[in-house]
Design a protein with these regions (language model features):
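Short beta-strands and strand-loop turn motifs
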Residues: 24-28, 55-60, 121-123, 147-152, ...
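An N-terminally biased module of ancient metal coordination in phosphate/nucleic-acid-related enzymes
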Residues: 1-86
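Conserved small/polar residues in nucleotide/adenosyl-binding loops
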Residues: 169-175
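Extended substrate/RNA-proximal surfaces in nucleic-acid metabolism proteins
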Residues: 68-168
Length: 179
């Protein structure tokens, strides 16, 4: 009988009701994501209609997009002022593990993700890992952060053994647990 059931849209299904989006590029005009405030507000409006309750805005920070925490915070304040909805907005960043990240880590100039401020959303090149990946991850941990690897499915060069040296220091892969 299942082929004859009434089809539902995602909105009708309630699938996203109470949902938290932990990684998006909705903060306007800061990276390769949303470019205008109107577009950001339109997306947030659609999120509201779907029942999303919380969004973590995670713009890129990398040598090719050297956003500063001050600039991102200023853009975030602008979005908060323009957005009149009920979704809780939070600011973090998606950090490329490059030389700029190393500088920012040394200065503690970071935008962590999660209410406790102890997790860093990180990424690497899709083609090659950083030459010192294991030590970079260990330095992140030594600074009191837990790395969350964005897009692990894209790193075809990685396998389970690449995660072994830091697996006991809470390298976080996709999970349904709360951050």
């Amino acid at each position: 009988m299942w082929p004859f059931r009434k089809k539902q849209t995602l909105k009708e299904s309630g699938f996203f009701r109470g949902f938290t989006d932990w990684h998006c590029h909705i903060l306007p005009d800061v990276d390769d994501g949303v470019q205008t405030m109107d577009e950001a507000l339109q997306i947030l409006g659609e999120y509201e209609r779907l029942g999303v309750k919380e969004v973590w805005l995670t713009p890129h920070i990398m040598e090719d997009m050297p956003n500063t925490t001050q600039h991102l915070r200023a853009r975030f304040v602008e979005l908060q002022s323009a957005y009149q909805g009920n979704i809780a907005l939070n600011l973090a960043s998606e950090n490329m593990l490059d030389n700029l990240f190393e500088e920012r880590l040394n200065k503690n100039d970071l935008l962590p993700i999660g209410k406790a401020g102890k997790h860093l959303l990180v990424e690497t090149s899709y083609f090659n890992p950083p030459m010192d990946l294991q030590n970079i991850l260990l330095r992140i941990k030594a600074k009191g952060y837990y790395p969350i690897l964005a897009h692990p499915e894209r790193y075809l060069y990685m396998n389970e053994s690449d995660y072994q040296p830091v697996s006991y220091t809470h390298l976080t892969l996709p999970t349904t647990s709360r951050v």
